[in-house]
A protein has these predicted regions:
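Substrate/ligand-engaging "lid" and interaction regions
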Residues: 149-171
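Redox-cofactor binding/interface segments in oxidoreductases and associated redox assembly factors
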Residues: 70-72, 113-114
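Conserved NAD(P)H cofactor-binding loop of Rossmann-fold oxidoreductase domains
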Residues: 74-76
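Aromatic pocket-lining residues of Rossmann-like dinucleotide-binding sites
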Residues: 18
Length: 171
């Protein structure tokens, strides 16, 4: 199965997308606020009759023992006038608390980091987990590229799928 950890809005979006594909049989949401994760899991489960069969529930780190993909969305929200780099120290501290819990229960999964600043936190995850770099992936600039393509499509009045532009550096 796939497991999700962290930021509620990113987690909800990713979890919803995962329920739309038949890639996984199980999805567990882990949050320091277990009740919040339970509510999200229930909401997602109620939508499953329109998607693919899947077990969705709120869990704990012990529930990641047999998974092969762990998606990490943990981190603080970006505040007004705060850059992604301003968030580094706070998010590194969060990662110092969750990565050891992940590796305690599973040292063979692929880790996908989508927290910001993603490049720095992906590197941090490699170092904290001791996993080979090939098993720790970051979403990089995919979202920034999608936003650029959307806005260019709007400005140029063309389908954004026809835009071939990429953001290649974090900011």
């Amino acid at each position: 199965g796939s497991r999700g950890l962290g930021d509620v809005y990113k987690r909800q979006t990713i979890a919803f997308a995962l329920t739309q594909k038949s890639l996984f049989s199980e999805l567990v949401l882990i949050d320091s606020n277990h009740a919040k994760a339970e509510g999200e899991a229930m909401d997602l489960s109620h939508g499953l009759p329109f998607a693919h069969p899947m077990k969705v529930y709120a869990g704990d780190y012990k529930d990641i023992a047999d998974c092969y993909l762990i998606i990490i969305t943990a981190g603080t929200a970006q505040r007004p006038n705060e850059t992604r780099l301003d968030m580094v120290h706070k998010n590194v501290e969060i990662f110092k608390s969750i990565i050891p819990n992940i590796t305690k229960y599973n040292n063979s999964a692929i880790l996908l980091v989508v927290s910001n600043p993603v490049d720095i936190l992906t590197y941090c995850t490699i170092k904290l987990s001791g996993f080979p770099a090939g098993r720790v992936l970051g979403s990089g600039t995919v979202l920034d590229t999608a936003r650029l393509k959307y806005h260019l499509g709007q400005q140029l009045c063309v389908d954004s799928r026809s835009i071939h532009a990429f953001i290649t550096v974090s900011y």
